[in-house]
């Protein structure tokens, strides 16, 4: 079964996208995220502890108010090099129409150089559910209850 296809409007802010580098694409048929590239003019080196805000060369507009997008790290960059998102996860509301920027943070032990056009993050579009808050005095009991961090163990 194939996934639903929804439109995502983009403005190309860097003319190298779509010519020198591909537009954001899914790496495989089953990929959930579109690969985002670093729209840099020159290589950028992140030394351990540094964080920088990088342009992806695009602006986006989701149009559909039942959708949002999240910017997520690329697993290989984080695991192999310690390069993660400086803000953990970037949440993009459907009414945002500005440039798509990515905060990269080097939490590793060695300097890491990002080349112009490198894939630096991924964009995943998700459905949202808006809720109405119900103030209650007690909750209906669940199996977990108030058990928090580490409550279920590791084994």
UniProtKB/Swiss-Prot annotation:
GO terms for molecular function: dUTP diphosphatase activity; magnesium ion binding. Substrate binds at residues 74-76, 87, 91-93. Its EC number is 3.6.1.23. One of its GO terms (biological process) is dUTP catabolic process. Transmembrane segments: none annotated. Its cofactor is Mg(2+). Coiled coil: none annotated. Keywords: Hydrolase, Magnesium, Metal-binding, Nucleotide metabolism. It catalyses: dUTP + H2O = dUMP + diphosphate + H(+). SUPFAM superfamilies: dUTPase-like. InterPro entries: dUTPase (IPR008181), dUTPase-like (IPR029054), dUTPase-like_sf (IPR036157), dUTPase_trimeric (IPR033704). Pathway: Pyrimidine metabolism; dUMP biosynthesis; dUMP from dCTP (dUTP route): step 2/2. This enzyme is involved in nucleotide metabolism: it produces dUMP, the immediate precursor of thymidine nucleotides and it decreases the intracellular concentration of dUTP so that uracil cannot be incorporated into DNA. NCBIfam families: dut, PRK00601.1. Belongs to the dUTPase family. This is Deoxyuridine 5'-triphosphate nucleotidohydrolase.
